[in-house]
Amino acid sequence: MVSTLVFILILGILVIVHEFGHFIAAKKSGVRVEKFSVGFGPKIFSVKKNKTEYAVSALPLGGYVKLAGDNFEEYKGAPDEYFSQPIFKRFRIIFFGPVLNYVLGFIFFWIIFCVGYPIITNKVGEVMDGYGAKDAGIIAGDRITSIQGKSVKTWEDIQQTIQENRINPELKVGILREGKIQSLSIKLKQTSQPDALGQKRRLGLLGIKPDLNETIIVRHGVFQSAYFGFKKTVDLTVMTYRALWFMVSGKLSIKDSVTGPVGMFIITSEVTKMGIIALMNWIAVLSVS
């Protein structure tokens, strides 16, 4: 029940923000906005101001904006109607919907980086059979402190450094065990796996998994958080348009790459259990994707 309500709330936020973008651009362009509704269906209540009816409706599944003369059947040629505007103004009205979604995503990412987010540490939780780490003697509870001489403090550092050195057959790995630093040579297993866009990527694997029960909270200053928030927004945007290009060009299956409403609901249900920061991150990802 809670997951359903959260899912409806998220969809509502995304749609309302999108429609509010159209609303702002229409007002700035001199187009008469006949109605701005939060929700669909029967009206619960409404007020009218400056020729615009503001309504709250019964079905909380987003909302909509009704512009004067936004279809040819109703178009009368009045100067404040949608189709009376030059094409650049009409484009601006359409464009501002997704722009405001991007702004929402950026703001949420910015807040997350400011408030703090959990990062998995460098502690090993599991060592897998058949990989170099097991053969070299790494055990659960060890901390990976360095790879190829580069200091690593989080699991993300470990993954990134391994991939930077994935062409090497062996890696020099520093570990902390019972207060003592040890240096091990670990064979790297070469493999390839599909990335987020379904493209094959060469990977190097040590055969270790993190201890998911140990995390640290990472926070950044306001300006640094703004930079990281902007960067994450741009990165997700690039990934989204790359995926669209791959789908159009036939390099990526639409079925395998597009998550439908059921998939979104399942992900939302899982994210809801992880707390407000994870939920904000999910909303931001949806907003810019």
Give residue spans per PLM region:
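Small-residue-rich helix-interface/hinge motifs
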Residues: V2-K76, V288
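Generic alpha-helical transmembrane segments of integral inner-membrane proteins
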Residues: T4-I8, G12-I16, F20, F95, ...
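Functional transmembrane alpha-helices
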Residues: E81, Q85, M128, Q193-S289
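Internal alpha-helical transmembrane segments
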Residues: L59-D129
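Alpha-helical transmembrane signal-anchor/signal-peptide segments
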Residues: S29-E34, G116-K134, I139
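PDZ-domain C-terminal substructure recognizer with occasional recognition of PDZ-binding tails
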Residues: I139, T145-S146, T161-R201
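Conserved PDZ fold ligand-binding element
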Residues: A133-W155, T233
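Envelope-exposed proteins and targeting segments
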Residues: T52, I120-K123, A140, P169-L171, ...
